[in-house]
Design a protein with these regions (language model features):
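Conserved signature/switch motifs of ABC ATPase nucleotide-binding domains
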Residues: 55, 110-113, 130-131
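Catalytic Walker B motif of ABC-type/P-loop ATPase nucleotide-binding domains
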Residues: 136-139
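Helix-to-loop junction immediately C-terminal to a conserved catalytic motif
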Residues: 25
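Short coil-to-helix segment of the ABC ATPase nucleotide-binding domain corresponding to the Q-loop/switch region
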Residues: 71-79
Length: 231
C-alpha cells in the first residue's frame, strides 16, 4: 500500500476482512506470513514496540464508535494523547480543536449516550485523527449510520484523504464507500483473488475484475468465475 492511498477491501461476509484488519493493525497475530507497517515487520516486534509503532502510525475506526461510556466527547478524543504522555491541558486543547473541525464543538461535554449515531462516529473519527496517523484502518465505518450521515462521514474521509494525505484501508459492503477508494481488493476465504479500479460495484464484482497472482504463482478464482468456466 502506497502512502496517501485509499484502498477498499470488499467481498462476502466471512471471507476474512475483519480478521485481516486486525492483523494489519497489530491487534491479532497472523497464523502465517508477516505484516509490515512503515517498513517494520510487526510480527517480530515486542509488545511494547508494537504499541509504540501503532500509536505513531495507525488509528482505527469501527462500525460502532467504541467510545468510553463514562467519558464525554472531549475526554474520549483526548485519551490517545494522554496515553502518549501528552499533558492533560494540551490534550484537551487539541481535542477541542479536532472536534471543532468535525462540527462537534457544541457537543464536547456530552457523554456518548447523549449523542446520535452520527455524532458518536464523528467523535470516534476525531479520536482516530488526534494522533495524526499516517494510516486509518476502518471496518464498516458507515455500516450503522443512516444514508445522510453516511454521506457526511464519507465527505469527511474524502477531505482528509485529498487535503491531509491520510491513507485509508476500509472494509466495506457499501457501494458508496468502495467508490471513494483509489482501488479495491476482493477477498474470499482469506485470499485476495482480484483487484478492482475506481468506481467498483460491490454488488457485481465480476464486472471489472483483474485477477491476482500471489507470490507462489497461484491464481485463486472467485466462485462465480469457476461456475462460468464449468468448474
Amino acid at each position: 500500500m502506497k502512502a496517501g492511498e485509499a484502498i477498499a477491501v470488499v467481498g462476502p461476509s466471512g471471507s476474512g476482512k475483519s480478521t485481516l484488519m486486525k492483523c494489519l493493525g497489530g491487534l491479532m497475530k497472523p497464523s502465517a506470513g508477516s505484516v509490515s507497517l512503515a517498513g517494520k515487520n510487526m510480527t517480530r516486534l515486542t509488545g511494547q514496540e508494537l504499541v509504540e509503532l501503532r500509536q505513531k502510525t495507525v488509528s482505527f475506526i469501527f462500525q460502532e464508535g467504541n467510545l468510553l461510556p463514562d467519558l464525554n466527547a472531549r475526554d474520549n478524543v483526548a485519551q490517545p494523547l494522554r496515553h502518549q504522555g501528552v499533558s492533560s491541558k494540551k490534550a484537551l486543547a487539541l481535542a477541542d480543536a479536532m472536534l471543532d473541525r468535525l462540527g462537534m464543538a457544541h457537543r464536547v461535554s456530552a457523554l456518548p449516550a447523549m449523542l446520535s449515531g452520527g455524532e458518536q462516529q464523528r467523535v470516534a473519527i476525531a479520536r482516530a485523527l488526534i494522533t495524526q496517523p499516517r494510516l486509518i484502518l476502518a471496518d464498516e465505518p458507515t455500516g450503522a449510520l443512516d444514508p445522510v450521515t453516511s454521506r457526511e462521514v464519507l465527505a469527511l474521509f474524502k477531505d482528509l484523504h485529498q487535503n491531509d494525505g491520510v491513507s485509508f484501508l476500509i472494509v466495506t459492503h457499501s457501494k458508496e464507500v468502495a467508490a471513494f477508494a483509489n482501488r479495491s481488493l476482493e477477498l474470499r476465504d482469506g485470499r485476495f483473488v482480484a483487484e478492482h479500479g475506481e468506481g467498483v460495484d460491490v454488488e457485481n464484482l465480476s464486472q471489472d475484475r483483474e485477477l491476482i497472482i500471489d507470490e507462489t504463482g497461484t491464481v485463486t478464482l472467485p466462485p462465480d468465475l469457476l461456475v462460468r468456466l464449468g468448474g
